């Protein structure tokens, strides 16, 4: 259909017609804790975090969905329409970095995501007792979790560890702090302390290293070879002796060997 506008009166009539046309749904907007954009929520270990998702500009009831990472959150029936809340309590270190997303059920492209930033003091773990033989290699692995990230260091017998070039090596990742010692000596005996220091707290974990004498183990191959040689020698000796005895017995039984009278 072609609209032909010839004057102001016709323009007003056209505007009235357009306004009287059936209107679609108003574009709904979501907010989480009053915010319309994705954001990071700073929180602490051991507290409770509440997230409230609400629909704005809706002309009819809207159903809401909550996701934790990629898994849908099971909501009660009274906690789905227009306003929906989820509660994380108590928050622990495993919740750090977790995404919570509220979505409009009829149009899941409409969403708001909240990422938890959980601060907590250093948590240390590892094998606290190790026994190794002299001249072997050993690694002391200190597992660490911390937010904010902790500053790490190694101590030996309550003093800062002096690293020996070629024997000591330190390898650090976000979740581990490893001390490797090659060709350990008796002087490496002692208590090694993994120390983690953050703005929240300083934590220490002790690793006890015992270096024992190297046990000399005779290689199995030479022993087996020696046994085989002994057995073969004995067998050959017995065989030769048996052959000689049989010859002697044969001479005794031979009539031609008797002395003539």
Swiss-Prot record:
Domain Ig-like C2-type intervals: 27-113, 121-206
Entry's localization field: Cell membrane; Cytoplasm
Classification via CDD domains: Ig (cd00096)
GO terms, molecular function: cell adhesion mediator activity; cell-cell adhesion mediator activity; protein homodimerization activity
SUPFAM superfamilies: Immunoglobulin
Processing after translation: N-glycosylated.
Signal peptide: 1-26
Protein name as annotated: Transmembrane and immunoglobulin domain-containing protein 1
Disulfide bonds listed in the record: 53-102, 142-194
Function as written in the Swiss-Prot or TrEMBL entry: May control cell-cell adhesion, cell migration and proliferation, cell morphology, and protects renal epithelial cells from oxidative cell injury to promote cell survival.
Positions on the Extracellular side per record topology: 27-215
Entry-listed glycosylation sites: 57, 82, 92, 117, 157, 189
GO cellular component: adherens junction; cell surface; cytoplasm; cytosol; mitochondrion; plasma membrane
Subunit structure: Homodimer.
All ranges on the Cytoplasmic side of the membrane: 237-261
Record keywords: Cell membrane, Cytoplasm, Disulfide bond, Glycoprotein, Immunoglobulin domain, Membrane, Repeat, Signal, Transmembrane, Transmembrane helix
Principal subcellular localisation of the protein: membrane
Pfam families linked: I-set
Single GO biological process annotation from the record: cell-cell adhesion
Highest taxon of the lineage: Eukaryota
Segments crossing the lipid bilayer: 216-236
